[in-house]
């Protein structure tokens, strides 16, 4: 039977999805299932690993059934996943010893402080590209080994396995035959040396984590094993893995130095490819692993905006200025500018490049002439300003010239925001026809690994651009707007 499709498993923080792509990179079928969020204590976030697996395996079957696709028509399955989330299970039984500790969970803060006290903060930064923070997997592993009865003893006997969500799904799909991750996920564990591309023995010793627990690290564009869907049909290659943000970077074909993407969600995630240079940031950005055009390891700078779409939710839910997020474009376009109004949405402090947890949100420039439209416009513009803050930091750190900005996520449907992003960054913003770029990246990696597609050059013909947003303001206006934004940010920090 002819191989016509590639399936991407997109395992996210709140739902599991399966998306089927045809040879032209068109979406043929989508299936999605939400799963339970567990909050056993303040600041703790968990998932049930078995529910993750049940939801992901069911949507895989459902996505093919909906489109009437036989499993023998599937060339490969790729995996993309929420990063950092930590699962430990028994090697013999496949039974998790504890719930998955989610990337958002802060329970291992004390362990991070202990590592800082041991003088490891700079070592971590230099060798992993990360900050010493509970966000990442390493301290979550230690917490499980320290707090689950018999876990550490079992781990030292080689009876337990660790994996991020990609590894867990691969283990389940291959019925326990394959214990593997890829460099993009390994690089988010706090245990992976991004220069040697191997597990870091110094950090394993510091956290007392047995190396035997850890998965083998294989390239992101590889065939790892095979699976049969619902136990039927032929064996399908499991062929591409990347963490969600790196998958989106590859889905946008940002495979050369200076190429960048911004995912506009609740927050914004920006990644810039820096090629074969692991750039250490002087602006608090993370250095991480990306995927190059041949599936090889590239590096990237990564930064996040805390309040993106969440700022628009605040306008709707707390201020009642809009009924729906899509209303913002209409109201923002009713005025020529913000009339001097700036919103700095530092509701939970400011992230990179400021890193000021004590900053708080504020509206500046209010006069009797300021109205709802000005405030809504200022809220949208704040997303673009914060993204520019990060992009400028990436350019300074890397020395790369930003070629263009690829965009994805829910907010890219807002033409006003995309145009202002182009205006304020003085770079062309490119919105793709297929905005499911995270899943598309996993599909591209899987398809390339099995020869379904031959090269990134071929993929460039598949990845169509829906709209180009070109800068449309002069340099003096751009500078004046941004200087005023920086002044507003400084005021939130005083």
Swiss-Prot record:
The keyword Methyltransferase does not apply. ADP binds at residues 13, 17, 266, 309, 410, 414. Pathway: Polyol metabolism; glycerol degradation via glycerol kinase pathway; sn-glycerol 3-phosphate from glycerol: step 1/1. ATP binds at residues 13-15, 266, 309, 313, 410. Keywords: ATP-binding, Glycerol metabolism, Kinase, Nucleotide-binding, Transferase. GO terms for biological process: glycerol catabolic process; glycerol metabolic process; glycerol-3-phosphate metabolic process. Inhibited by fructose 1,6-bisphosphate (FBP). Its EC number is 2.7.1.30. GO terms for cellular component: cytosol. Gene3D superfamilies: 3.30.420.40. It catalyses: glycerol + ATP = sn-glycerol 3-phosphate + ADP + H(+). Pfam families: FGGY_C, FGGY_N. GO terms for molecular function: ATP binding; glycerol kinase activity. Glycerol binds at residues 83-84, 135, 244-245. PROSITE patterns: FGGY_KINASES_1, FGGY_KINASES_2. Belongs to the FGGY kinase family. Key enzyme in the regulation of glycerol uptake and metabolism. Catalyzes the phosphorylation of glycerol to yield sn-glycerol 3-phosphate. NCBIfam families: glycerol_kin (TIGR01311), PRK00047.1 (NF000756). This is Glycerol kinase.
């Amino acid at each position: 039977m002819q191989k016509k499709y590639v399936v991407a498993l997109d395992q996210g923080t709140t739902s599991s999805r399966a998306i089927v792509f045809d040879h032209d990179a068109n979406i043929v079928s989508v299936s999605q299932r939400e799963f339970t969020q567990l909050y056993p204590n303040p600041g703790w976030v968990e998932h049930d690993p078995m529910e993750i697996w049940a939801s992901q395996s069911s949507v895989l079957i459902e996505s093919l059934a909906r489109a009437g696709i036989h499993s023998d028509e599937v060339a490969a399955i790729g995996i993309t996943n929420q990063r950092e989330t930590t699962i430990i299970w028994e090697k013999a039984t496949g039974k998790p010893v504890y719930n998955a500790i989610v990337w958002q969970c802060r329970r291992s803060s004390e362990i991070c402080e202990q590592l800082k006290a041991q003088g490891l903060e700079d070592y971590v930064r230099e060798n992993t590209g990360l900050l010493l923070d509970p966000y990442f997997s390493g301290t979550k592993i230690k917490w499980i080994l320290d707090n689950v009865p018999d876990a550490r003893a079992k781990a030292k006997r080689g009876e337990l396995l660790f994996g991020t969500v990609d590894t867990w799904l691969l283990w389940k799909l291959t019925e326990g035959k394959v214990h593997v991750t890829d460099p993009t996920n390994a690089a988010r564990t706090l245990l992976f040396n991004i220069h040697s591309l191997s597990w870091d023995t110094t950090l394993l010793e510091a956290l007392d984590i047995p190396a035997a627990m850890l998965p083998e690290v294989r390239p992101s564009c590889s065939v790892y094993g095979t699976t049969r869907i619902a136990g039927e049909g032929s064996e399908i290659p499991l062929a591409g893995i990347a963490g969600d943000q790196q998958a989106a970077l590859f889905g946008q074909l940002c495979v050369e130095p200076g190429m960048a993407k911004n995912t506009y969600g609740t927050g914004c995630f920006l990644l810039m490819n820096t090629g074969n240079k692991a750039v250490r940031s002087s602006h608090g950005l993370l250095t991480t692993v990306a995927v190059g055009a041949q599936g090889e390891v590239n590096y990237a700078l990564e930064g996040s905006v805390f309040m993106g779409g969440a700022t628009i939710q605040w306008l709707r839910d707390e201020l009642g200025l809009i009924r729906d997020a899509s209303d913002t474009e209409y109201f923002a376009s009713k005025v020529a500018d913000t009339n001097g109004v700036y919103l700095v949405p530092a509701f939970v402090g400011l992230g990179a490049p400021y890193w000021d947890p004590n900053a708080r949100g504020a509206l500046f420039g209010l006069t009797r002439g300021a109205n709802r439209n000005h405030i809504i416009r200022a809220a949208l513009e704040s997303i673009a300003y914060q993204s520019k803050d990060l992009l400028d930091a990436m350019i300074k750190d890397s020395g790369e010239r930003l070629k263009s900005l690829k965009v994805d996520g829910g907010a890219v449907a807002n033409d006003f925001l995309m145009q202002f992003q182009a205006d304020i960054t003085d770079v062309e913003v490119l919105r793709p026809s297929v905005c499911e770029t995270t899943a598309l990246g996993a599909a591209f990696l899987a398809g390339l690994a099995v020869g379904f597609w031959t090269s990134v050059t071929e993929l460039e013909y598949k990845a169509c651009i829906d709209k180009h947003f070109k800068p449309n303001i002069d340099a003096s206006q751009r500078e004046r707007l941004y200087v005023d934004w920086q002044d507003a940010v400084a005021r939130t920090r005083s």
